[in-house]
Structure formats: C-alpha cells, structure tokens
Amino acid sequence: MRLTNLLFTTLLLFVSVFARSQKSNEFTVLQWNVWQEGTMVPGGYDAIVNEIVRLKPDFVTFSEVRNYNKTNFTARVCASLKEKGLSYYSFYSYDSGLLSKHPITDSSTIFPIQDDHGTIYKMKTTVGKQVCAVYTAH
C-alpha cells in the first residue's frame, strides 16, 4: 500500500511539473484595430486599457495608432496599464503598434508609413527560453 501511494504521489508530481512546463511554452496575442486610438467611441481609450487588463495577453498588436497631439499612444497605454498594476513594454510607432509583457530586445520598421497607412513593425523578445518575433501591420 505504501509503495502504491509513493508511486502515485511521484507520478502526480511528474504530471504536475510536466503540465506546468508545457504552459510556459504558450503565449497569447490580442490583435486590435483601435479605430483612431479609441477616439471614435465615447470612453474608447479607457475601454482599450480595461480589456487589456481583463485579458492580460502576452502581446497586443494595434491598428490605427495615430499619436494624436504629439503623444506616444503605446507608451500612454503602457503607463495606464502600469497604474492598474500591469507591466508592458512598447516602442514608438505610427499607424500600428505593439505591446509586450516581456522586455523587448529589438524592434524595427519592416515597411514604413506611406500616405498615412501601411506600416509593418517587428519586435523581438524571449518567452521562457524561446526567442519570439511578433509583427503588426495595418
């Protein structure tokens, strides 16, 4: 009986560790056209921030970033998330944008803005032990 309990407990421990290690290889992405930074809907900006807080995605990709009034939209969202206890990283972009829960190790413009549309940005980060590249386009 003791041996059976010991084997069962050991098996349960291995299954638990395996399940936990499998989970660390997963990440979530939220892609969102924020329709002029949420300005087209009353309370739109706050709704954007609140949905990110609710969902807690690893990465957020935005379309229709405008940086109105010489602001940095993604930095503003990161600051609002920080006020709610979440840490996200970003870099300056125009037309589309990226947020990451994981520190960004590199970012680049793949396709620059032309006639107020059409950007593609790339960022790199590490999730667990895996280097990941995330792209956003509009």
Predicted regions and their residues:
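N-terminal, active-site-proximal structural segment of metallo-dependent hydrolase catalytic domains
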Residues: R2-L3, A19-S80
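Hydrophobic h-region of N-terminal signal peptides that target proteins for export
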Residues: N5, T10-R20
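Generic structural signal for short, flexible, solvent-exposed coil/loop and linker residues
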Residues: L7, K23, I48-V49, Y88, ...
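Ser/Thr-centric signal marking residues that sit
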Residues: T9, Q31, T136
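Residue-level marker of intrinsically disordered, low-complexity segments enriched
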Residues: L11-V15, W32, Y89, T125
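Short low-complexity stretches enriched in small and charged residues
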Residues: L12, I52, K56-P57, Y89-Y94
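Structured beta-strand-rich core segments of catalytic domains in phosphoester-bond hydrolases
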Residues: V41, V65-H138
